[in-house]
A protein has these predicted regions:
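Active-site catalytic loop in hydrolytic enzyme cores
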Residues: 83-154, 168-175, 244-251, 261
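CN hydrolase (nitrilase-like) catalytic-core segments centered on the catalytic cysteine
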Residues: 59-76, 144-230
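Hydrophobic residues at beta-strand termini and immediately following loops
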Residues: 6, 104, 128, 191, ...
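Short, acidic/polar
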Residues: 17-27, 143-150
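Short beta-strand scaffold segments in enzyme catalytic cores
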Residues: 77-79, 91-94, 126, 206-208, ...
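Cys-nucleophile CN-hydrolase/nitrilase-fold catalytic domain and related Cys-dependent amidase chemistry
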Residues: 15, 23-97, 103, 166-186
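Active-site-proximal beta-strand elements of phosphoester/diester hydrolases
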Residues: 1-14, 91, 133-142, 160
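Short, basic/aromatic-enriched C-terminal tail that caps enzymatic domains
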Residues: 232-234, 239-262
Length: 262
């Protein structure tokens, strides 16, 4: 399976422009892909403006569904979601080309950015099976809390974390993501944004590791419709190689047992 991570330069609170930017990038994908991953809050940036929140009938999920169908590719990304007009979640959607989807609500809300004052935290994990591979979904700050993303019972093959992780803390990304890959005996894919917003500066820092902690990404750059140079990382997920490694080095069988108290 081919996975592409897009380090989108997100236009601040401009959904339509971000949709156009992404479509222009997808138009330039060479050799296609099975899964295209966008950063956290890809349609708005890391906003606390809850008036931008949508439900499942809103334009962002509908755009994800139509775009997945148009390009015959699964798409993942998050946006501010509300169901009842009161609670708002930082919700990631994993949308398949046939229009079906799964979602994950961010568990660990970034209090240093006051996300916890505006958003409601999630309490359910999400594992998506697509083309025979199981993906566990995480969002940004979740990467710092390994218990939450622990591959308990060997339930997933790939851990995906989508983020708005600022340049000032860029040094933490590599050890955190690589550790998640090694300790969970899984692939780990981290997808960060690029550009600037009202609070932070970002830089291309998406990363992909195999189950041994080896870097496996191929890097390329394309220009979006706004002229922004966009980093794309790609990798192949080899389920047979992963299964063989787990059979030959079954450290997962000696993992500690635990339960998370909500």
């Amino acid at each position: 399976m081919k996975v592409v991570a897009c380090s989108l330069d997100i236009a601040w609170e401009d959904k339509r422009l971000n949709f156009k930017k992404i479509e222009s990038i997808l138009d330039q994908l060479q050799d296609g892909a099975d899964l295209f991953i966008l950063p956290e809050m890809f349609s708005t940036g890391f906003t606390m403006n809850l008036s931008l929140a949508e439900d499942a009938a809103g334009e962002t999920l509908q755009w994800m569904k139509s775009t997945a169908a148009k390009y015959n590719i699964a798409i993942m990304g998050s946006f501010p979601y509300t169901q009842n007009g009161r609670e708002v979640f930082n919700r990631a959607y994993f949308v398949l080309p046939d229009g079906t989807w799964s979602h994950y609500d961010k568990r660990h809300l970034f209090r240093m950015g006051e996300e916890n004052k505006y958003y409601t935290r999630g309490d359910e994990k999400c594992i998506v099976e697509y083309k025979g591979i199981k993906f566990a979904l995480n969002i940004c700050y979740d990467i710092r809390f390994p218990v939450w993303s622990r591959n308990k019972g060997n339930k997933y093959d790939v851990l995906i974390n989508i983020a708005n992780f600022p340049e000032v803390r860029i040094g933490a990304i590599e050890p955190l993501v690589r550790a998640r890959a090694i300790e969970n005996m899984s692939y780990a894919i981290f997808v960060n944004r690029d550009g600037t917003d009202h609070n932070c500066i970002y830089c291309p820092s998406s990363q992909m590791y195999d189950f041994k902690g080896n870097t496996i990404s191929q890097e390329s750059f394309v220009a979006d419709c706004n002229g922004c140079r966009t980093q794309l990382l790609s990798c192949e997920i080899d389920k047979d190689a992963l299964d063989e490694f787990k059979d030959n080095f079954p450290a997962w069988m000696d993992a500690d047992t635990f339960n998370i108290i909500r």
